[in-house]
A protein has these predicted regions:
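Two-metal-ion RNase H-like nuclease active-site motif
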Residues: 185-187, 341-345, 422
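Alpha-helix C-capping/helix-to-loop hinge sites
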Residues: 17-24, 44, 153-156, 451
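A short small-residue
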Residues: 14-20, 151-153, 380-386
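Charged, compositionally biased N-terminal leader segments and the immediate start
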Residues: 1-26
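Charged catalytic cores and adjacent phosphate/nucleic-acid-binding surfaces used
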Residues: 2-3, 194-339, 343-349, 360-373, ...
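Accessory alpha-helical DNA-binding modules that contact the DNA backbone or grooves
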Residues: 4, 28-234, 241, 255-256, ...
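Core AdoMet radical
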Residues: 378-379, 421-422
């Protein structure tokens, strides 16, 4: 197999083909298919090259047989003849511009074609020189918007989304734990604190034989290059592009090491200040009292020596957790086991949705929800496309789907099924489904899926439209952020929180890998304002249901307890949020 590309590069290639179809006026569903395939490839926790070698490309949602065949050609030869034919005649520079937030294919094509743009730097120079504003369909404002978007692109880092780093780290940890010399192995840093994006993966091991552990570690099959190797430390680069740093410490002092390298920096600075006032010092080796080092096997003992309760890693950001630990007022954080159901699940039911269709049938999803031990679940496909259907057509499609779901409710008495839809909050402050259609449902999840660049006042008004609707129970992915590609839009959060409480509307913590939205900081603010939250997987395939754990991590970072999350309630209490 030629050494081709990471998932990110393959996703970029697939998006370029979608762009070509958009410019050439190709089949709308071809465009959607390639966009969806790109999204699923980019957010896959397994490298596509590895899946291809194992004959498992078909396990990635959205990879139809034709795309699989093209990828097979890519991995075998390093090129795809069909893709090269499609791109013939297209200005090469346009494909680089597609990475700019808000830059659609037709705009990228027009700029690259007319101004002979070669890359993003070239576009920036032309924009600063005022060359864009005089083009047909552009103006001074659009020129400034392009410059702002270029700056946004440059501000991005090489950090990866939490689920990708987490599952990569789990493979390394599983390998390390098979070593007879390893007593414990744990992640460190931002990964252990479950931050939404991660840089390098840091791991700590406890062992009396550190050299043997290092020698074992560097034989991990996913390593592409050994960066550094010492007697206690080693850094390697994996085939998926992630760097993993391993540090091996003494078992009897592992608690202090784990605490120190978990961070955060601000949390540790605060601990150090407290220690100094007690005339002691803290380090990754332990706590020094009157010149004598005291070692700690566990973090619990480390914090206890400082007069504090154990602080969960997700809370260690110096946002009040140290004070709470000192006064024994830390929250009892929500756990994955507390979740009783998942209501944001997309299927492959042919409702002709406004956005991407799910991969699996109602029946497959119901079976997996039962396997997970859920009391209830929501089938919540995107509503029919508002721009491609009349109101009557939308209602007819909802009626047919409702009939199907009612049949499923009758045949699956051991799990409660909610007939929901995820509807669009349109740019004109209307919902994408008429009231007569919404009345057929058990409830609705509403979110913004277009016009993300409207100003704070306008976006807030759109969200309030949904919150004030008697048919909407949940606001999905409230900030609209896409980690690494789109910033959250500005909203007037105090007003939104107030209206959510008043209207008994739930704000979602969306666990989709590149959303993790509501962010943890807003989770904490929402809870403080009395808002109830719900954690959802937003799954588009049966295997995505497991993403819910990342939503739980976001909730924990936001200090959420079981009582703050609606879907920890048993069915008889939970159903009161909906029209059942």
């Amino acid at each position: 197999m030629p050494k081709f590309t990471t998932n990110k590069e393959i996703a970029k290639l697939l998006r370029s083909i979608s762009a070509v179809y958009a410019i050439k006026g190709g089949n709308y569903f071809q465009m959607i298919a390639y966009d969806r395939a790109a999204d699923n490839v980019e957010h896959s926790t397994s490298e596509l090259g590895d899946l291809w070698q194992d004959g498992k490309l078909g396990t990635v949602p959205g990879l139809g047989k034709s795309i699989q065949a093209y990828l097979d050609e890519l991995f075998k030869t390093g090129r795809v003849g069909h893709f090269e034919s499609l791109k013939k005649g297209m200005p090469a520079g346009m494909f680089e511009l597609l990475s700019i937030p808000g830059m659609g294919p037709k705009t990228a094509y027009k700029l690259a074609k007319i101004l002979k743009i070669k890359d993003i730097g070239d576009l920036e120079l032309k924009a600063k020189a005022g060359k864009i504003r005089d083009l047909p369909g552009f103006g001074a404002k659009s020129e400034q918007d392009i410059l702002a978007s270029i700056n946004e692109t440059r501000s991005r880092t090489d950090r990866v989304i939490l689920p990708f780093a987490y599952e990569t780290a789990q493979r390394v940890l599983d390998y390390l734990k098979k070593c007879k010399d390893v007593e414990r192995a744990e992640p460190l840093g931002s990964l252990r604190r479950m931050v939404a994006t991660i840089g390098d993966i840091d791991i700590a091991g406890a062992s009396k034989s550190p050299q043997e552990v290092i020698d074992y570690f560097i034989k991990f099959k996913e390593i592409s290059r050994i960066i550094d190797k010492g007697s206690r430390k080693s850094s390697v680069l994996l085939t998926n592009g992630m760097q993993v740093d391993l540090l091996v410490g003494k078992p009897q002092a592992f608690g202090a090491l784990l605490q120190h390298f978990t961070g955060s920096k601000n949390h540790n600075i605060h601990l150090r200040e407290i220690a100094q006032k007690k005339d002691i010092s803290v380090s990754d080796y332990g706590i020094t009292v009157k010149g004598k080092l005291k070692e700690f096997k566990t973090e619990g003992n480390f914090y206890g020596f400082l007069g504090m309760d154990y602080i969960e890693p997700e809370l260690r950001e110096d946002t009040g957790e140290i004070e709470a630990a000192t006064t024994h007022k830390l929250p009892d954080l929500i756990k994955l086991a507390d979740i009783k159901g998942d209501i944001h699940i997309h299927s492959n039911y042919p409702i002709e949705p406004s956005h991407d269709l799910g991969k699996d049938s109602f029946e497959v999803l119901i079976k997996e929800a039962k396997h997970l031990g859920y009391e209830y679940m929501g089938l919540s496909d995107h509503s029919p496309g508002n721009s491609t259907h009349s109101e009557k057509q939308i209602v007819d499609l909802i009626q047919k789907r409702t009939y199907k779901i009612e049949q499923l409710k009758s045949s699956h008495k051991d799990i409660r099924i909610l007939n929901l839809l995820e509807i669009d909050i349109l740019a004109n402050n209307k919902l994408s489904v008429p009231d007569v259609g919404l009345e057929l449902l058990d409830g609705a999840i509403a979110g913004i899926h277009s016009s993300h660049r409207q100003d704070k006042k306008t976006q807030t008004k759109r969200i309030l439209t949904a919150i004030n609707s008697p048919y909407v129970q949940v606001i999905s992915h409230p900030t609209g952020r896409l980690l690494g590609s789109r910033e959250a839009y500005e909203l007037d959060w105090p007003i939104i929180f107030k209206e959510c409480v008043k209207n008994k509307t739930l704000l979602e913590i969306n666990a989709w890998p590149n959303r993790l939205d509501l962010p943890d900081t807003l989770v904490k603010e929402a809870i403080g304002s009395g808002v109830n939250l719900i954690i959802s997987s937003d799954s588009h395939a049966v295997e995505h249901l497991g993403n819910l754990q990342y939503g739980v991590s976001v909730a924990r970072r936001g200090w959420a307890q079981k009582k703050d999350i609606a879907n920890t309630l048993p069915w008889l209490e939970f159903k009161k949020w909906f029209n059942v």
